[in-house]
Amino acid sequence: MKASRAKPKRAPAAKKAAAQKKKHKIFTPRRTRRKVAAKRASKRKPNAQAARKAAAIASLPGVVVGGRIGPRYAEILSRDALVFLAGLHRRFDGKRRDLLAARSERQKRFNAGELPDFPPETRHIRDNDSWRVAPIPADLTDRRVEITGPVDRKMIVNALNSGATHYMADFEDANSPTWANNIEGQINLKDRWQGQIDFTDPHTKKRYAIGPKPAVLIVRPRGWHLSEAHLTVDGEPISGALFDFGLFFFHNAKAQLAHGSGPYFYLPKLESRHEARLWNEVFLFAQDTLGIPKGSIRATVLIETLPAAFEMDEILWEMRDHIVGMNAGRWDYIFSFIKTFAKNSNYVLPDRSQVVMGEGFLGGYASLLVRTCHRRGAFAMGGMAAQIPIKNDSQANAAAFAKVRADKEREVRDGYDGTWVAHPDLVPVAKEVFDRLMPQPNQTDRVRLHVRVLRDDLLKIHKGTKTEAGVRLNIRVGVQYIDAWLRGRGAVPIYNLMEDAATAEISRAQIWQWIKYGAVLEGGVKVTAEFFQRALRQEMQVVKREVGAANYARGRFPEAIKLFRELSLSREFVPFLTIPAYELMLTGSFG
């Protein structure tokens, strides 16, 4: 046991000041107003300014900022920005909650045996060949390689300089939504448009600066189901989606337009045309409030839920003045498939490594997305290549890159207009494929009207096996990811792949499904709660050896293990692991 370090006693006045600071969660100067040396005064000045701004924040009626106000936080959480956020919340949060309730009701029908299908009441939208989405902005017409990642300063500069055509700055699956990550990410993105993003790493002393041709910036806010607990409006936490979107749009939209670009977004986790309609209403309100022309906001919708796959035309229709394309978010889509059929034993999947694009329900989904988008003049974006360089094994690295190359060649042949990568070293690999097979900016002219995808094509189970190795890999990956997420990291390298929340969701969902239906693995072992708990204990010893005992002890593995266990053994399927994980992050407990 480490010896505890004695803390110096505080004077009564200091205790009182500390208590007040904790109570109000605002940044206060460390010193009083007595005269000090000019050097100390210059250091104190921005702190005093932050305190004055924080006091202004605290006086805004109905709005409470519960997170600390660190350096430059008040610049993002300005009074005008908070008024804008409050307006978004008061106008749209009720509708958001109604839509989340509608999700729950729809899931009850699926649990009772109903199968997803194309809505008969919107057949006229799907059958009408005359409508198209609005013309695509010039800097979105060639999106052959997009790099994605979290919003820390180093990642932003490296992504902008990566050679990719576009960079998706992610507040969602690749971001752990700590208060610091969210606000400092907003500071970093604002600095990009103010020309102040260049910096020197304090540890390595390496200089980072944006090059002459940076990637076009696109931002992904959180999904409709997540909240931002550190900001409440009229006593309710604001939607994470409105928080992320609102702050970025408020601070950057006009600067983006002035630079010849625009406020561009990726929208995650939509499940219906009604949820798309809500985003469209948010866009109209935001543009009108800031005096920005209608249609300035442009969005790409990730089709990463099974219900949304049956409403692609309808989503494009609802957002036709603001949408530019759709993306095949394959990892979350697999998770959504498991969740949709949580109570249906006819849809138990094989090892997730065997659920591949081009086959089963993913094959139908991929074909339908391209056909639907191109028919409406929108882009079809391919999925993520999560591989990262394997520095100590050139043969394994070459094999990994060959796998990426083959996947991107499939995407081009299928008609996709661009793709995603998670690491800068994969940009030239993907770019070479698209340059070779798609010399023009895009292939939206490949309409593929001959393609017909029916309901059963979107529900076709992949053939494959269930293995003990698959169970154990799911355990190791899922727990390691949750541990990192709880410590503030949302994009995590695990076994030579850059993992985000989607992989953790698949991992725990597949184990839950196999336990519930007593899946029999190759070799005859039946997946039971007892088998899972034994494997969990064994695999955590493997993880401890892999990461090292010291790193394991410094992590949050006990909490991650408990959460992973409870999600996997829960009687009812928990819709999103990030909801109890966020509660755990904030309070130290969940449930």
Regions found by a protein language model. Give the residues of each.
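Arg/Lys-rich, intrinsically disordered low-complexity tails that mediate electrostatic binding
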Residues: 1-54
